[in-house]
Amino acid sequence: MLSLWAIGLLGLLNQVEALWSPSSYQSPAQQRSAQFSSSGWGTSPAAQNPWSFNRPMPNTNMPNMNTGSLPGSMPGAMPGSMPGAMPGSMPGAMPGSMPGSMPGSMPNAMPGAMPGGTGSGFMAGAMPGAMPNMRSSNNMMGNMRNGYPPSYMTPSPRNTICVAPVSQPRLCMVNGENTHKYRLKDVIEFLGHPNIEKVPKCVPGVPRVNCADYYAAQYIWKRGYCYCKNFHSNLPSYQMGSTQIRCVLNNCGACSQEFYVDKQRVVKCE
């Protein structure tokens, strides 16, 4: 009697277990065995070494791995970035630097260069070999390159400095008494060099070139050492400080032009 009651109790327990347990239940060991066999993990003839990459790795479908990244990239990395690099940076570059540049420098610039510069140590917009807003000394031979001195600004109502010869007119503001006359020899002596064409500097103290001396006037005109080009006596006066200086161009017939400034004040031509 007791045995029949025990058998009935076991049957009831089996029915309850069948109701609460799904028919497709598998133990963790059974799940891993079935997963590896379906992926081909156990079919390789090589030794079953989990660190041997001569066989395909099992598809474990781990969450949050390689989400949105390229194949082979690290988890959470930007597409195409190297492991350990900042997002979007190039391999081997400093964080935040541009490709091909020195660490911390601007793109396409030499180390220490300012943006827009052309090389190391140059300010923005400066040309190679010249510093911005720098004027040479009385003799500009030291700054000449390929026979041409650096170009300076042309005269304007508020800027009455000398400009480089050859390409731009040069204005020397000198004593305007208009009484002295100089020959070519005198002009050369003022320049301080026998070859007037190779000394690009002004002639301080030369108020007027003698129009009768054709060659002197032509040298002054062509080489631009001390002259006013395309100015006439009716033009407005130039302003330099509190002194108005007007450049006068006179036509002296068949020989050439004469040039002077009609103020009785010597202004240094730099």
UniProtKB/Swiss-Prot annotation:
Biased composition (Low complexity): 56-95
Keyword Transferase: no
Entry keyword set: Secreted, Signal
Lineage: Eukaryota, Metazoa, Spiralia, Lophotrochozoa, Mollusca
Native source organism of the sequence: Lottia gigantea (Giant owl limpet)
Cellular compartments annotated: Secreted
Region annotated Disordered, chain positions: 31-95
Top-level taxon of origin: Eukaryota
Tissue specificity comment: Component of the acid-soluble organic matrix of calcified layers of the shell (at protein level).
Compositional bias annotation for Polar residues: 31-52
CC per GO annotation: extracellular region
Secretion signal span: 1-18
The keyword Nucleus appears for this protein: no
Protein name in the entry: Methionine-rich protein
